[in-house]
Regions:
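Terminal peptide-recognition signature
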Residues: 22, 26, 41, 59, ...
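Conserved CoA-thioester-binding segment of acyl-CoA-metabolizing enzymes
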Residues: 1-62, 98, 195
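Glycine-rich beta-to-alpha active-site loop
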Residues: 97-144
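Short helix- or helix-capping micro-motifs
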Residues: 68-70, 163-172
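Glycine- (often His-adjacent) and acidic-residue-rich active-site loop
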Residues: 61-98, 115, 227
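C-terminal long alpha-helix characteristic of the crotonase
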Residues: 27, 130-135, 185-234, 247, ...
Length: 269
């Protein structure tokens, strides 16, 4: 059963078979974001992150462009803001990116078109990114006399510091093949296969223990780039001990030994 939420002006939201789809819906301006879209993205990912019926969230976009970054009309208005107002406004964008990045549910960016500037941040904060072969990518901020500051922690994690040095400074456009080589996206597919590829991946995630998936996401955030210290090792020891003793940990092992489905797959829809 599919449920749809129409409470947003710049987003479309639906949930079907444990998969939530959040679609950027400003195709007339290439899904550029403004303060309204930022607030709505922050709200919807906060809500979906606590929805027990949702096990994976797809971030998609309407039209030919995934996201062109910030709305130029909004940016023009920001030029007249005071320093304090600019700080507050930038913080809203930063908090939205953090909300998606820290969302307890796995997130997948389904990239059907070009990604520019702040749109790169939306891709980078998702756990998995799949793009069509014709998609182009660009960190274009320096062309406008700006810097990709709020998105930088996530983009650098996604493509690596060395690659970021080149593309932050040059504002070069690169294609999906290069994005895949850099590790910025995980897969590049033909346009007609994007929906099926994303659906297949969602189905695989939905079959897994929701608690274990959440634990893995937290684990990845905690250990990525961290030095291997005694404290880190102790945290990993505690992590496996806790998950083994958890309800779903016990159920998963028992179900495997008994050659049956675990209960998270047998709960009525």
């Amino acid at each position: 059963m599919q449920t749809e939420t129409n409470n947003y002006k710049s987003l479309l939201v639906s949930v079907e078979q444990h998969v939530a789809t959040v679609t950027l819906n400003r195709p007339e301006i290439r899904n550029a974001f403004n303060d309204e879209m930022i607030a709505e993205l922050n709200d919807v990912f906060t809500q979906l992150g606590t929805d027990d019926d949702v096990r994976v969230i797809v971030l998609a976009a309407a039209g030919k462009v995934f996201c062109a970054g910030a709305d130029l009309n909004w940016m023009r208005a920001m030029a007249d803001y005071s320093h304090e107002e600019n700080l507050a406004d930038a913080d809203k964008l930063a908090q939205m990116l953090k909300t998606i990045y820290q969302c307890p549910k796995p997130t997948i960016a389904a990239i059907q078109g070009d990604v520019y500037a702040g749109g790169m941040g939306l891709v980078a904060v998702c756990d998995i990114a799949i793009a069509v072969k014709i998609a182009n990518f660009c960190l274009s901020e320096v062309r406008l006399g700006l810097a990709p500051a709020t998105i930088s922690p996530y983009v650098v994690r996604a493509m690596g510091a060395r690659a970021a040095q080149r593309y932050f400074l040059s504002a070069e456009v690169f294609d999906a093949k290069k994005a895949r080589q850099l590790g910025f996206i995980h897969e590049r597919v033909s346009e007609e296969w994007l929906k099926d590829e994303v659906a297949t991946l969602c189905a695989k995630i939905v079959k897994n223990s929701p608690d274990a998936v959440k634990t893995c996401k937290n684990l990845l955030h905690d250990i990525a780039g961290a030095p291997i210290t005694d404290d880190l090792i102790a945290d990993t020891v505690k992590g496996i001990a806790d998950i083994r003793a958890s309800t779903q940990g016990k159920e998963g092992v028992q179900a495997f030994l008994q050659k049956r489905k675990p209960d998270w797959l047998t709960v009525p829809e």
